[in-house]
Amino acid sequence: MQMGESPARLRDGDFIKKLYHARSWAPARYLKYDPIDLAKRSMAPIQRAHTKIVGTTQADNLRSLAAKIWMIEQAQHTVDLVYYIYRHDLAGNAILGALCNAVQRGVDIRIMVDSLGSWSMNHEELKAFETCADNAGYIRDASGRATPFRARIQVVIVNALTSLSSWSNRRSHDKLIIVDGSFPGRDIVMTGGRNISIDYYGIKADGTLNRDSYIDLEILLRSENSTTANELTVGDVSSIYYTLLFLHKGNKRIHPSPYADDEQYGPNTYPQILGRQQRDLAFVKNLPAMKTVFASMPGYFANDFRSSQVRIAHELGNLTAKDTVTNVRETKSRNLNSIGA
């Protein structure tokens, strides 16, 4: 799918084929453009959207985790996530468990984590998670019909410390999840300050309430029903942004180890890791405090949104600029979508 191309211009079969290829990882040497440069030069539009703030209270902390899992469980076509910090604790495992179930029903998944904020020697948990796609279902079109395209899990490390095209002090602090971003009326975007770590979500590892969680907030965005057929939605623009970050030349695509199953016993074999993720998902959903929150999610996503005008701002230029600190004003001015431009 060409950047800026509206889904309404394409028949379902053509659209899914183009979408599948547009969502595919490709090494930088195969690209005809620099994704970060394109992101800086392309002005993001001001758009109409339904918005809701996920606030800073204890109840909001619980609601934020439930919302992420609920969004994934409601996804019909695609899910994209990127987080600076992704901890493989109760919250992180529960989300991966939900994503594993999603790909097996035919939802195409991309996930990015920052190489420093989510530092790991080998990212075994994410590699194990990718094997969920061994039993992936087939992506469905907007009418719900199965297509010939099998759902995937693509895991990318942002500005990998082992990449020759990366800089150790150039980080992605994105916290973003996009569900069905290219499907108007179904798209949901969540962004803000919460990372994927139990410290943000109001519960402790044993499931008891944690009233000392980090204080942060997020915003939910959905496209308006009044969006015209040829108008890009907030889901479209968020997905385009995600793709440009996904294809950044400093990133590294990781894959499961071909010899991972040679170790039959131990806590870190792929089946053991996947089992933990599913158990943690079930544990979170059955916590007394969380069961009530999960039960409220259909109404939460249906009501009390505000009609707003929004624009997706970003600082992707900082991933490649060599004078970010010494020449802040000029660096921001080169990015048409910078908050400080």
Protein language model regions, located:
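Non-Sec secretion/translocation targeting segments of pathogen effectors
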Residues: M1-M3
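HKD-type phospholipase D/PLD-like phosphodiesterase module
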Residues: E5-R9, G13-F15, L19-T78, I85-A341
